[in-house]
Amino acid sequence: MTTQLEQAWELAKQRFAAVGIDVEEALRQLDRLPVSMHCWQGDDVSGFENPEGSLTGGIQATGNYPGKARNASELRADLEQAMRLIPGPKRLNLHAIYLESDTPVARDQIKPEHFKNWVEWAKTNQLGLDFNPSCFSHPLSADGFTLSHADDSIRQFWIDHCKASRRVSAYFGEQLGTPSVMNIWIPDGMKDITVDRLAPRQRLLAALDEVISEKLDPAHHIDAVESKLFGIGAESYTVGSNEFYMGYATSRQTALCLDAGHFHPTEVISDKISAAMLYVPQLLLHVSRPVRWDSDHVVLLDDETQAIASEIVRHDLFDRVHIGLDFFDASINRIAAWVIGTRNMKKALLRALLEPTAELRKLEAAGDYTARLALLEEQKSLPWQAVWKMYCQRHDTPAGSEWLENVRAYEKEILSRRG
């Protein structure tokens, strides 16, 4: 340990102790909160099923930064490079289109064997895996409907895809000893004025019930459902709205996924966490950064990211909230995007753990809102950065922007050689 870091650490311990915070305990708690990194930042949501195909479903990755991963080996290598620069526990979130097979596999026929390389890799790197059926970028989703499709055969195809995905998810959990959270998001909706808003929702309700009908061990697999306000080409009507999935998760006791970009721009998911937790057993968070729409910009250490982290910590939701990231920026170095976004999420969690919440609660209960605001603002000036640097050192990762040198070297040696 360098003398400078040692001095800063000792000072930080004293400063936080003065407001009743044990920084060592904060670091222990931070190691209880893995962040699930999303594989699709590495290749702009291309996947391996049809890498040259178009991205559909009302989502978009903009930019053309060179060096994106073209196959599973490259994607895993890029993930390893990113993970070396991020301290603390991590998971990986996979979509079904990231299967590996020598021959084409229909989505309703995916099996655990198509993901065995990911499982072996996760074991080697001590990671948990999460999963998602991929209900987009496919000929049978081209008209904008999947699980709510009016055509029985097409709807059944997507039901079978989701059922197969649940078995893959359970395989992850069984093999890795940590439950896989499988999130269902569908792009279903309409571009313009919709006359019958009820029938697609009735079909979706029945389809989801069929999807989750097979009983799976909750120690291996957790079902989650995700709403969205709108997508490109589905501006007027989204079948899986917030109200639909809140009702579904509540009545079926599944996990509910809250995506930071899937609501009106004036809404924030940090305010929804405490409300949803009263009704659903678990939450999955997709931390993202919407810029005027669900643009999936790289996560910043901004007010909303901090508010999300604070809600988790203040209400001791460690065992009920699963933290995932969901952004994909193709205009910058993709490894840097992972590192920036994931480190920012972890910084926000650390800052939340360093808050004197008990004291703030007392002030709030006493109606002393002046002191509450004063303490919240003074908290921002306490030396949390020194605690972060110690955390990074203990996890053998760069503490500051020197991580960028590693990314640049990898870009020069590896990424620049990709076509």
UniProtKB/Swiss-Prot annotation:
Catalytic activities: L-rhamnopyranose = L-rhamnulose
Main enzyme class: isomerase
Gene Ontology biological-process entries: L-lyxose metabolic process; rhamnose catabolic process
Cellular localization per UniProt: Cytoplasm
Cofactor binding mode and count: Binds 1 Mn(2+) ion per subunit.
Keyword field: Cytoplasm, Isomerase, Manganese, Metal-binding, Rhamnose metabolism
GO CC term (a single one): cytoplasm
Matching InterPro entries: L-rhamnose_isomerase (IPR050337), Rhamnose_isomerase (IPR009308), Xyl_isomerase-like_sf (IPR036237)
Coiled-coil regions listed: none
Pathway: Carbohydrate degradation; L-rhamnose degradation; glycerone phosphate from L-rhamnose: step 1/3
Enzyme Commission numbers on file: 5.3.1.14
Pfam families found in the cross-reference section: RhaA
Cofactor: Mn(2+)
Molecular functions per Gene Ontology: L-rhamnose isomerase activity; manganese ion binding
Positions of Mn(2+) binding: H262, D294, D296
Family: Belongs to the rhamnose isomerase family.
HAMAP family per record: RhaA
Known function: Catalyzes the interconversion of L-rhamnose and L-rhamnulose.
Quaternary structure annotation from Swiss-Prot or TrEMBL: Homotetramer.
Name of the protein this chain belongs to: L-rhamnose isomerase
UniProt source species: Escherichia coli O6:H1 (strain CFT073 / ATCC 700928 / UPEC)
Organism phylogeny: Bacteria, Pseudomonadati, Pseudomonadota, Gammaproteobacteria, Enterobacterales
Protein encoded by which gene: rhaA
